[in-house]
């Protein structure tokens, strides 16, 4: 009887040890993912995007020694309600630190319903440039609504704030060392500062609080190969998807 009890105690102790080890690994990987994102997110908000001309990101052997690098800034909102087509609006800027010039495009995309076949050839791009922190179309736009959307567009990096990234805890952590890829997902509330900022700027057709997804590929310690992006997912199900995507990347320049 005593031997059975001892075996049972030993088995339970071993089980707790295994659980503790896995929990510790998860906590450690979560801290690594946060640290990887903090290098970029700690810069938010950057109200004047031209300040990025004087900021350098992570450099590795992919950069030419004379290349100051290019910042790629992107933000987009995607909305699909009640099985309708998905509408996406966003902007991408390429900020060349060598020439201190910025070009990019505003885009509007419609992804048709599944029963009609999903494809992206409905995307329309409107080329833009940035001068004195103002985004200006480089070609004539007759659609006044689009012109206004470009004029009023703000990137999330200009108003988002992740100074208190450590407050997000107990995330759903995923890590694949083979790719490598990694992610951390957190349930937010509608009282979260960044959620309030998004609702202030976009007509988001749901009262559900979003989940914050920090997702990336490449070396966790830093790499110019791969990507990092953040996503606020309000709704994610068949026929209804509402999410906001943002990214700030530092890459080698195509023209040195």
From Swiss-Prot:
<protein>
    <recommendedName>
        <fullName>Uncharacterized lipoprotein SA0093</fullName>
    </recommendedName>
</protein>
<feature type="signal peptide">
    <location>
        <begin position="1"/>
        <end position="24"/>
    </location>
</feature>
<feature type="lipid moiety-binding region" description="N-palmitoyl cysteine">
    <location>
        <position position="25"/>
    </location>
</feature>
<dbReference type="InterPro" id="IPR038641">
    <property type="entry name" value="Csa_sf"/>
</dbReference>
<feature type="lipid moiety-binding region" description="S-diacylglycerol cysteine">
    <location>
        <position position="25"/>
    </location>
</feature>
<dbReference type="GO" id="GO:0005886">
    <property type="term" value="C:plasma membrane"/>
</dbReference>
<comment type="similarity">
    <text>Belongs to the staphylococcal tandem lipoprotein family.</text>
</comment>
<keyword id="KW-0564">Palmitate</keyword>
<dbReference type="Pfam" id="PF04507">
    <property type="entry name" value="DUF576"/>
</dbReference>
<keyword id="KW-0472">Membrane</keyword>
<keyword id="KW-1003">Cell membrane</keyword>
<keyword id="KW-0449">Lipoprotein</keyword>
<keyword id="KW-0732">Signal</keyword>
<dbReference type="InterPro" id="IPR007595">
    <property type="entry name" value="Csa"/>
</dbReference>
């Amino acid at each position: 009887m005593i031997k059975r009890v001892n075996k049972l105690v030993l088995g339970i102790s071993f089980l707790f040890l295994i659980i503790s080890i896995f929990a510790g690994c998860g906590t450690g990987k979560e801290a690594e993912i946060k640290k990887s994102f903090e290098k970029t997110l700690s810069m938010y908000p950057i109200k004047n995007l031209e300040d990025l001309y004087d900021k350098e990101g992570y450099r590795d052997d992919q950069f030419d020694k004379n290349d100051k690098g290019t910042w790629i800034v992107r933000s987009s909102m995607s909305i699909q309600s009640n099985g309708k087509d998905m509408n996406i609006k966003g902007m991408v800027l390429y900020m060349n630190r060598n020439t201190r010039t910025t070009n990019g495009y505003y885009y509007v995309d419609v992804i048709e319903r599944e029963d009609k076949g999903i494809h992206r050839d409905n995307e329309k791009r409107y080329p833009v440039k940035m001068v004195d922190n103002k985004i200006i179309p480089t070609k004539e736009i007759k659609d006044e609504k689009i012109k206004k959307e470009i004029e009023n567009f703000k990137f999330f990096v200009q108003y988002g704030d992740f100074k208190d990234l450590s407050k997000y805890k107990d995330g759903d952590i995923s890590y694949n060392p083979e790719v490598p890829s990694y992610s951390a997902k957190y349930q937010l509330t509608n009282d979260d500062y960044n959620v309030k900022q998004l609702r202030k700027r976009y007509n988001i057709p749901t009262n559900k609080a979003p989940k914050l997804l920090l997702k990336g590929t490449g070396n966790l310690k830093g790499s110019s190969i791969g990507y990092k992006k953040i996503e606020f997912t309000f709704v994610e199900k068949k026929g209804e998807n509402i999410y906001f995507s943002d990214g700030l990347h530092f890459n080698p320049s195509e023209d040195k």
